[in-house]
Amino acid sequence: MLFENPSKNIESLIAKSADLTNKPFVHSVVKINGEYEIEEEDIDLTVNILCRDKEGKRLEIYDLELELFKSNKELVLVISKLNFPDEPILWCGVKTLWMNSNNGKKCNSPKYSSRLENLANRIKSFLD
């Protein structure tokens, strides 16, 4: 990554990735917990990705929760719909799969799967 202060810019990187994969909306990122240290190549971070239309009106239906962490030195992203806890969850590590949010078992991808998979791949390409 080519950032002078990456810990302050990861939120911007995630927001810009969401902007590109969920046009025409604008996104902001709020850190919930965790840290990101590029020098240690370690990450354990949870953020909310908040969506707005071009006029600035909140669109909570598109809000997401994103968890980023390393597992066996591999970057893993878990994306869920923030305000819809019963919707499937995207697990994007070495493999990408969709999980039932109630029991954690593999399930079919939802209609909107490509949008979230594209977001995960874009973020991974910046951080991996």
Enumerate the language-model features and the residues they cover.
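N-terminal soluble domains immediately following signal/targeting peptides that reside
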Residues: 43, 48-51, 69-70, 96, ...
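Negatively charged, low-complexity tracts enriched in Asp/Glu with abundant Ser/Thr
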Residues: 1-65
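Aromatic- and glycine-enriched beta-alpha-beta binding-site module
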Residues: 58-98
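Ampiphathic alpha-helical segments that act as solvent-exposed interaction surfaces
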Residues: 94-128
